[in-house]
Amino acid sequence: MGKGLNILFVSSELYPFAKESGIGDVAFALPIALKELGHDVRIIFPKYGAVSEKKHKIHYVNRLRDIPIKMGKKYESAAIKSSIITNAKVKVQAYVVSNDFYFDTRKGIYHNPKTWEEYPDNAERFIFFNKAVVETCTMLGWVPNIIHCNDWQSALIPAMLKDLYPNQFKKTKTVFTIHNFYRQGIYDIKEFERTGMSQSLLTDFKFKNKFNFLKGAIRHSNFITTVSNSYSKEIIKDKEFSNGLNIVLKEKKSTFVGIRNGVDIYSWNPKKDEFLKYKLKSDLDDFKSKNKELLQKEFKLDLDPDIPIFGMIPRIGYQKGTQLLIDAADKIFEQNIRIVLLGEGDNDLKNALRLVADKYPDKLKLRYEFNEPLSHIIEAGSDFFMMPSQYEPFGLNFMYSMIYGAVPLVRNTGGFVDLAIDITKSNKKGNAIVFDKYEVDDFVNAIERAVNLYENKDLYKLIVKKNREYDFSWKKSAKEYVNIYKQVLREPNKENDENT
C-alpha cells in the first residue's frame, strides 16, 4: 500500500466549479489537506452546464471519451474529462463526468435555476453519476484504497462495489459522510431498477415504501461520518429531521462519528482573498470599515458606519431559519439595524421575504442568487453574521465570519453547539451571540443583545480581534479522516455488514 493512500473523493459539488452548499467547499478543502499529508487523492464530480470548460481548463481524457453506462434497459454515454484544483502548494486531479442529457445542458445542480424546482429525473441523473464513477476507475485501471462518498448523490457506490464489482474492488473500502441527514434521496421504488443491482439488495434501500439512497449507504459503507460531533448525536436520536432513518443509523453507531469541518484557508483568507477589493493588512478596523462601505454601496444602503449590518447567506428554506426571520421582522426592525441576505431557494419563502423587504425597504436588502464573490464581501463588510437555523449540521459560515471579523449570531443547534460560546454569558471566552429556542422572542432578544454589544465598541472590537485567533484549518480533521481510512483498511472484508 506504500506510505500514502489512494483516495477517490466523490462529490456532487466542487468549488470553484459548481457549488450550492457547503459540500462544495469541503470537496475542495479536504482533498487538498489530504494531499498535503502525502496521499494520492483524486476527486470526481459532474460537469453541469454552468461549468466553464475554458475557465477551468477542463479537457478530454482520450481513453475516457465514451464510456457506455447501462441505465436499466438502455445505455448512456459518459465522457470523463480532467482538470485540477490547487491551493498554490499542491494540486489535486479532478475528474469531470460529462453527459449532455443529464448534466451538460442543465445550468442547475439539483434544481432548475429559473423556477427552483428540483429536476424530476434527479434519481436517474445521480444513478448515472454513481455508475460513471466506478466505471471511470475500471477504465483507468486504478483501484483506490478508499472511496469517500458524500451525501445521497453518491450513496449507491458502496453497495455497487460489492454487488456489481466484487472482484475488481474487493480491497477497496468506503467511507460515507452525511452533510445533511434531512436530504436523503427519496424516490419511487421503481427507480432502483436503473441501478442494475441485485433485487435482493432492494430491502437495503427501501424505506417507507420508497427508494432511499441514503439508507443504502448507511447499510453498506465501511464507516460513516458527519460534519460535527453534536450533529452526530442529534441525528442518532432525532426522528423529526431524519425521516425516521435514525433507526437505521443506530445500527451502525459503532462505525459512526462526527468530525468537524475545517476552513480552506487558501480561499477564505482576508489577507489574500481574490474577491476583496480591500484586503486585510495591518489595521483590522480599516479593513472592516472599507468593506462595510463597499457592502453598503452594493446593496444601496445608507453610508452610515454606526448602523450595524447583519449578513445572511442561507439556502432559503425552513432549515436555515428563513421563516423565523419573516415571523420576527416587525420586532427586529424596531431596532436600527440593516440586514443583507444573499441566497437562493424556496419560492414561497422568497416571495414572503420580498413582502418584508417591501415593508422595510431601507432595512432589508435581498439578492436571490449564488454569488461566491459577493458572499466574501458580505463576510468582510458585515458587523454580525446571522444563522438562526432550525437545525444545522455544521455551519461553515460561522468560521468564515470569525476569520473575516463578523460576530456570529446563531441558534444553539448542531455544529454550533461545538463552536459557539455565548458572549452574554462569558465576555472572556465568548465568540458569538447565541439563542436557544427556535422562537421569535428568543431570536429578537439575540438581535437586541447584538445591538448592545455593537454599541460597546471596546468589547465588540476585542471579540472581533479574539475570534480571528482561532485555528480553523483542516489539518487536525484531515488526520482524523486518515485514521479512519487506515482503521477500515485493517479490518477484514465482509461480504455484507451484519445489519444488511
Show where each model-derived region lies.
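Catalytic cores of nucleotide-sugar-dependent glycosyltransferases that transfer UDP/GDP/TDP-activated
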Residues: M1-T500
